């Protein structure tokens, strides 16, 4: 609370997350129009997130970690990972050429820039709480491995189901 610049970054982050939620609602409504059961995927995502939170909290509890610390660590890891993917969207012309819908490409470019900003804010908060030492690095690295596993498993399942729904699964 003593760092005014960080507090401003956090406030901007919260505002961007509200906008992010608004965009997801619009995206989900569009997907719903095409017959996708968005509510089902949201429920499944919620179960995965809550299960992962509890599991990771149990693993790191012996090291004095609270649920809030776990949540911050997970946020930092996930923001880093999504920003890494987002940066590819911003620089990879092949990916950009695949996006033929101008409304969707505009939304994804905005999202990519936002994710890069979020990574910086999440890391700044993480560093303010945990510092820069070996323990902070080890925690951040283990959370990233955990997050990458979840990010691989959950979306892969969703893509499989979406392809199945679209009858494009061979």
Sequence positions of predicted segments:
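Non-heme di-metal
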Residues: 1-170
